Regions:
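Catalytic cores of large soluble enzymes that bind and process phosphate-bearing ligands
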Residues: 26-29, 47, 51, 68, ...
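Fold-independent oxyanion-binding glycine-rich loops
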Residues: 39-41, 52, 62-64, 77-80
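Alpha-helical support elements that line or immediately flank enzyme active sites
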Residues: 75-97
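Short, well-ordered amphipathic alpha-helical segments that serve as non-catalytic structural scaffolds
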Residues: 54-65, 90-97
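N-terminal amphipathic/basic leader segments beginning at the initiator methionine
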Residues: 1-50
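A broad, structure-centric signal for solvent-exposed, well-ordered loop/edge residues
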Residues: 43, 66-68, 73, 83
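Short coil/turn connectors at secondary-structure junctions
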Residues: 30-33, 54-56, 68-73
Length: 97
């Protein structure tokens, strides 16, 4: 396997890519817990999802969005699994995207 080569500027060094990480108050530690990566144009995308029978709303909605192999943004949170939120969780995940 090839060594990883870090690029100055990180992911935003790629033309058309914007990214941000913020403190949304999900984690009690007060650390950054929400990220957004945005492409100015739809891009080829692939993902690996859990095989667990109980999938959180964000996983289900993400599977819907990436079905055609394209994406324009990634929203990622940490500190809360968002599992077993029912129909409201699906609604909330769709609203975010």
């Amino acid at each position: 396997m090839a060594d990883v080569q870090w690029i100055d500027g990180g992911i935003t060094a790629v033309p058309g890519i914007l990214a941000a990480g913020v403190i949304a108050g999900i984690k009690p530690s007060g650390k950054k817990d929400l990220a957004l990566i945005y492409s100015s144009a739809p891009a080829r995308a692939a993902a690996v999802f859990t095989t667990n029978q109980v999938k959180g709303a964000p996983v289900l909605v993400s599977q819907e969005h990436i079905r055609d192999g394209r994406a324009q943004a990634i929203v990622a949170s940490s500190g809360c699994s968002n599992v077993c939120t029912g129909e409201q969780g699906i609604k909330d995940a769709r609203e975010i995207t």
